[in-house]
Amino acid sequence: MRFDHTNRLWLATTHGLIFRDNGQWHVYSTTNSNLPTNYIYSIDFDSQNNVWCGTFGAGLTCFNGTSFTTYTTKQGLESDFVATVCVDKNDVVWFNCRSSQYPEIYGLGLSSLHNGQFKTYTANNSQLASNTIWDIETDAKNNLWLATGDDKGVTQFDGTHWNIYNTDNSGLALNEATHIALDEYNRRIWFTCYTGGGVTYANLQYDNSAVTTLNASKELTIRNNHVLLDLPANVSVFDTTGHLILSDYGTNIDLSNLHRGIYIVHTSNTNYRAARIIIP
């Protein structure tokens, strides 16, 4: 799910490319367009508001508002299974191709498309930590941030230098980061880390592309409508409209009085900030 430069909502789905405009939903599929497949992994937008889509088995495709232009292994892709897609501030399209045999788990490196030319960085020809990349994001300085597989943590790439952050050299909660989100207002990068029982959230604050703090919540558990924490923390619960529903402090916060619905739980103390979506 992404918003384009005109604030229209776009969805990557298994039923095609969907967007919402002026209160109306629109669907592009193989039946009403030249979209190569209905299985869309991810989407992002270039400076011209073209939509770039990674697909499951049909390559990388670009929608200019009228038609789709598709790139496959015939044009130079490592594979036609293209997972996460990210367009940087120079309109370089970055993406991770996946193994055609095991596309859900095996990646083929960090690839880019710029001015019609493909380039791929791998763990063999560069300092890329893992060929499997779960997510890609760019920061305000146009650095790439990669959530890498194989327990390799998070990688920052400025086009020349690679910086790797893991549990040994930072406060990253776990080494298997799965998703990345950019908070431009607060100059923070947020990561989710796979825990086997859900996700934990870490935030990274950067200044001039240098890491100044990296603090993570390693113990945020929600069980039987209670927030359980390893250390006392401020806990705030918001509904989906952003209204504060509950505020408390401690290590065991009772949520049993919440009505059924979707809520966002924020926890924070001097050591970490964390968030979790819950449905009590």
Say what each PLM segment does.
Residues M1-A210:
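Carboxylate-rich, polar loop motifs that coordinate divalent cations or form catalytic acidic clusters
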Residues T212-P280:
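C-terminal outer-membrane/trafficking sorting elements
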